Amino acid sequence: MKLCGVRSSGVSLTRSSDFPRFRAAHHGGAHTATRHQSLCGRRLDSYMGAGKRWCFRPLLAEPRRYSNASSAFTTDGATAPAHGEGLYVSHYAMPEDARRLVGTPQLLPRNPAEEVAFKKNLIRSFPQACIRNVSVVAHVDHGKTTLSDAMLRFSNLLPADGATGTFTDRLKVEKERGITIKAQTCSVLLTLRETGTQYLVNLIDTPGHVDFQYEVSRSLCASEGAALLVDVRQGVEAQTMAQFYAALEQNLTILPVLTKMDSVMSDAEVEKTLLQLEDSTGLLSREVILTSAKSKRGIEQLFQHIIDKVPPPCGREGFSDMKQLPAMHPGSADRKKVEKELVPLRALLFDCWTSESSGMADGAASAPVSTASSVSSGTAPASGGQSVAKDGIYGLIRVMDGTVTPGTTVTFFHSGKKHEVREVGIIHPTLHPTAALTAGMVGFVFFPGLLKKDVFIGDTLCTLPTRKHTMRVVATGSPATASRTKPATAAETASSDDASGSGSSSVVEPIPGFKTVQPVVFAGFYPDEGVYITQLREAVDLLCVNDPSVTVEQLQCPALGPGLQLGFLGFLHMQVFKERLLMEFGQAVLVTPPQVQYMYVEQHGDPDDPAQRKPVSVSNWRWPHEGVGAYLEPFVTATVLTPSEYLNEINSAALSAFRGEMQEMRVIDGARTLVRYRMPLADLARGFFSTVKSSSHGYATLEYDDLTYMTADLVKMDIVINKAHISALSTICLRHEANTHARRIIGSLKEKLLRSSVDLPLQALVGSKIIARETVKAYRKDVTAKIHAGDISRKQKKWNDQKKGKERMARRSVGTVTLDQSVLAAALGATTAR
């Protein structure tokens, strides 16, 4: 039996109150431990039905001891390993690999004549019973990338002495920051030595930061299992629980894994983490797998648990298009028989990328390189020998039912448009074309000429093999609006497909999409000097193919011109997106604070009628009050789910700093509380999400919905420089916030404006009232530098002449102030990406 990753011949099953006595017995020596082990083995059956509370503890393989360089000891004839001075020998020892599994990488053959045979044999050897789809999830810096690389090296896909992150961290920004941003998939081929059975394990390495939770949710939709990693030194943290609940909602098999076992300095650390994991998740300690990617221990045991415990896919197998079969005479008996056995293709599209935004071309340079004989026209060879087309979109799919092959024409449920698949394959760890992707497999498909507007992450790709097959009509909108319950629901179409032989039409159902996420951080992106808005929009659109969680809206700023307002899942998400624009597309942008759209209704108008609302503009001729009945501000309902101990701090900030109004407070369980606030969208966008995360140390979650408009007291604030109105800096704000905004803008202008030969007065006005004022002092020439003696009146005469000259210059230079883009951006609170 394996307990906590330790092989032992029995189980130590004791009461919680008897645990100190149990520990003392084990410290007594090997004889005592053996006697206690045999005793527990005889009483195991009687204890299981006693109905009492028991604690499972792994048996000691040997008594725990301290060793140093000057003392050597032996236990049961075995010499303890020398770990150096003062190091601790833990009894939570990871077992040696049983060498039952061996990695068998299938690379493209060097002989072009063998390529067709290779593709066919690769697919035929993997029925659904031999496929496992697993996502690797964990908190930030808990060892996901290192463990994923160790698993690939165990499978002989990466060199044993390669650097960490050679596969998972493909993007340049990932390598510079040292974090995982995009979920990466790799198909691993393993052979069981005893039976020769070959397994296809699809590993998905996911990010750990809360800003990239959308990547995790999409990956879980394509999996039947999740490996939940926990750092043995750090224990259970915020994202550990978030990933656990996300996997639980998808009804996935969860494999608990302790990482970084090579860093353990005391068994108390392991026991504390095991107890914490069991108390917070309910996962039994005896099911935890102990691993160390650095020492390459526990990797085979983790693979063995994936094969043994993660259920295989359960889709419907079969061909999905007559083009996938040899030509048959229309109306022949063979063709009719084959048509009855056709299975409509149903595949979930859970990621997309282009050749410019994937990082695939340089992500696995250490992989074995084959010849580029398979590169066709219109494609360019990339590392690993794969063919990467230049024009088009790659889609990462999980095939639920049927088969997709090159040349298959698939239909997108959302748009109803049809597109032909040019190439299919697996990521191993680079793009390797195959003959087909069958039910249960995870792989890529390439669509030449596919546009971004036709791609929706979470959409269902399908085929209609015969005229009897029809698609269920879906409502217009994003296909990912419905919450997914489980990865595969093949039973939805089983009954209708079985009726196809009786003359009734078979309805192909869409796969339930995963829940979309809402942006919580907004920012305006404007092209830097020398960059056109069309170039920026094209780069953003291409990057949004690879990052669908970003929302895009058009903006028009009088100061900076046309721009884009983007919505992100956090500040780190925004910074990474800005860096990717610069690194991958060369687009330097100005990032400004978020803006919200205020509305107004005319006199005698109804504020509750959306048709009567009109957007407020600083150039509106009706401003400030001519013919206006009321000004409106957008409000949302923010829902916060937080551990109860952090509720007071979050509630205080929401009510005092973010103009929130509590609508509901409900205790979910003994540890969590749900609170709903009504607050302005502007306050939520300017930092409420960050406050919630920092106050709860990352454990709380925030969602918002129900956008409505409520009356507000708005004013127009004008900026005057040297008696000239600067229309580009005119803004609309709430009356009680006007003074704060005015001081910030005037202070920024004072710092950024260059001094001239005359004083520049800076003023902020609401109507005709000055609410803030500063002065940029003029340069003064030292006109008395050559006067070294004499009466003081000589210097005063020079100073008076200089003063009169300054006054004449000021009268001639009224209103002649030129502001460049950097000054305007600084006044609006912008930052430049360089």
UniProtKB/Swiss-Prot annotation:
EC number(s) given by UniProt: 3.6.5.-
Record keywords: GTP-binding, Hydrolase, Membrane, Mitochondrion, Mitochondrion inner membrane, Nucleotide-binding, Protein biosynthesis, Transit peptide
GO CC annotations on file: mitochondrial inner membrane; mitochondrial matrix
Database matches in InterPro entries: EF-4, EFG_III/V, EFG_V-like, LepA_C_sf, LepA_CTD, LepA_IV, P-loop_NTPase, Small_GTP-bd
Annotated residues for binding of GTP: 138-145, 205-209, 259-262
Main subcellular localisation: mitochondrion
Record flagged with keyword Cytoplasm: no
Disordered as annotated region, ranges: 363-385, 476-507
Domain tr-type G per the UniProt entry, residue ranges: 129-314
One GO MF term: mitochondrial ribosome binding
Biased composition (Low complexity): 488-507
Record-annotated disulphide pairs: none
Function (record text): Promotes mitochondrial protein synthesis. May act as a fidelity factor of the translation reaction, by catalyzing a one-codon backward translocation of tRNAs on improperly translocated ribosomes. Binds to mitochondrial ribosomes in a GTP-dependent manner.
Family: Belongs to the TRAFAC class translation factor GTPase superfamily. Classic translation factor GTPase family. LepA subfamily.
Entry protein name: Translation factor GUF1 homolog, mitochondrial
